[in-house]
Amino acid sequence: MTPTSSPTPSTKRQLTVPTVADLAAEGKAPEILFWVGCAGAFDDRYKRVTRAFARILEHVGTNYAVLGLEESCTGDPAKRAGNEFLFQMQAMQNITTMNGYGIKKIVTACPHCFNTIKNEYPALGGDYEVIHHSTYLQQLINEGKVAVQGGESYKGRRITFHDSCYLGRANNIYEAPRDVLAALDADLVEMKRSKANGLCCGAGGAQMWKEPEPGKKDINIERTEEALATLSGQAAALDNLRGVETERTAPSQHSLQGSIIAVSCPFCMTMMSDGVKNKEQESAVQVFDLAELIASAEGINA
């Protein structure tokens, strides 16, 4: 398995994703709108997450649809960069489209889209129930609709979870992704800077779209070093990181081979993957989204 590949898939089969327009033409409406997001639609790496989550929705029989070409950027990057006018233009376009279809419930795999639609669209007339896919996956597992068995086994593999800023600090969602990972029966290890004290991947606040300011180290490299040190149990490596207090006695060391950095955000996926490449650990450590891991463990082809 290469680090840029998806987890081991089952037999490949065709995936047909319905659009809201197609259902509307038949006089039907989806129970849930799957908001794909820009990264989920255009970024080659995160398209795999989109497929994995769509496979899961199909697998459990969720009545869902996507907007397809009618979906536009939520306006999050524009707003974070200070262009409120552009944000409101993009937001109103989406709100008009969704209200026209009578959309009530939305699920998305992007914390940036989640935060914007949930917390900022209501002021512009867009009131919806918005769920991040980590919470939805948690619900499916708790309800027994996803058994997390029949596919790839993660038992004993070391996994550390990187908290997304917009999922965690902005919306206080910390346990859902961890509950999802716990279902894999893997060896979950927490980074010192986690949950409310987690370190940003470096891409939020529209930083994804600009060159970094001069400094000693890029944030994603710092965060990746912490993840790798946590996975390998190297206290000495943690000593070199800012804001990380290490234990007095070094924990037992582990091989990085087969270890996983789990994420729940397309920005974090890009930044952590680049960090792993920078540290030349691509052959040992992989970066996966929660949906990819669950689809793989369930034996669903993504």
Name each model-derived stretch.
Residues 1-71, 75-109, 114-125, 140:
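Iron-sulfur-cluster electron-transfer modules
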Residues 36-41, 70-81, 107-116, 160-170, ...:
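Local cysteine-cluster metal-coordination motifs and their immediate loop/turn environment
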Residues 42-48, 140, 165-183:
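Active-site glycine- and acidic-residue-rich loops that bind
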Residues 84-86, 118-119, 172-173, 177, ...:
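Iron-sulfur (Fe-S) cluster-binding segments and ferredoxin-like electron-carrier domains
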Residues 85-90, 146-163, 208-219:
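A polyampholytic, Gly/Pro-enriched intrinsically disordered region
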Residues 124-153, 193-196, 277-302:
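Short, flexible loop segments at boundaries between secondary-structure elements
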Residues 180-197:
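Aromatic-lined glycan-binding groove of carbohydrate-active enzymes
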Residues 214-259:
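A short, acidic, amphipathic alpha-helical segment used as a generic capping/interface helix at domain edges
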